[in-house]
Amino acid sequence: MLKLSRVFLPVILFASCLGAYGQQITKEELLFLTPEWKGERFPDGRPKVSDAILDRMKLVTLEEAWAVLRNENYKHQYDEGWMTINPDSVLVGRAVTATFVPGRPDIHRVIDEKGHSKEKRVKSQNSWTIDMLVKRDVYVVDQFGAHEDGPTIGDNLGNSIYTKTGNGVVYDGALRDINGLRDIKSFTSFFRSYHPSHHLNNPDGALNTTLVGINKPTRIGKATVMPGDVVLGRDGGVMFIPPHLAEKVVKTSEIVRLRDMFGHQRLREQKYTPGQIDSRWSPEIEKDFSAWLNEHINDLPVPKEQIQELLKSRTW
């Protein structure tokens, strides 16, 4: 009996993964998995970090975000080693996740049947998650690093993704039609490789990819990603920020940014030594920093109301 349970347990777990609505997560599951998010949500339960926070996130560096997450014990939210489209741009948005596995005919058939007949999905599985995208989403795909015969995204779907979201993708696999994708304005994307082939999705013939998860927890390289995470892609790396920590990441980054600007200016003026700026600031330097904030409040790359909030919290 024990041996049988070991055999059937993975099957039972996989069946439960498909859930009552096929491979798409239910609202109840998503609420259960994101209890620390207290803000607005999409109708399906996905956390909806505000547009204002997303706007401010564009100036956050990977180092700043990494430090905040590390201090909160989130140690597996970053991955690197990407090829990029628009490498000098920053990708920010709310994650919508898709998980593919190497194609398996029996699973593929029942997912196709349920998707087409009961969920009214159209065409092949590689477009199903894309049909759900909205503005400021980022399509995050675990394509298990598939290379030859692996690409599920080319310039046709790329145009659809960009039209729906205004963003590019994070794609753990190969893309195709790279020239066409580069022609899409602001399609800032991170992907593993390029190959001119395309995925194969015929369960009665050539098949190499099957979609088993929509908006479920997924793995991208060394990172764990949840739907609704804030995606921050820049400088060759991608950070996946839990929604309940997004505001803290932004505010911490803004404080660091302002202190760096002040410190660099004072060093150029030779008012303080590098040792004074690099160590814990004295009360005199902190007072000077507050005065500098007030003096330049309309010219700094941080919202004025955020600087005012910072000044109110200071005691010097």
Give the residues covered by each predicted segment:
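Bacterial N-terminal signal peptides that target proteins for export
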Residues: 1-9
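Bacterial N-terminal signal peptides
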Residues: 8-17
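Boundary at the C-terminal end of the N-terminal hydrophobic targeting segment
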Residues: 20-22
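Amphipathic alpha-helical packing elements
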Residues: 25, 29-58, 65
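Active-site and channel-lining beta-strand-loop segments
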Residues: 38-42, 218, 231
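Buried hydrophobic positions in well-ordered alpha/beta secondary-structure cores of metabolic enzymes
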Residues: 45, 161, 229-231
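Feature captures the catalytic cores and cofactor-binding loops of soluble hydro-lyases/lyases
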Residues: 56-64, 68-227, 240-286, 294-306, ...
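Short acidic-glycine loop/turn motifs at beta-strand connectors
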Residues: 234-235
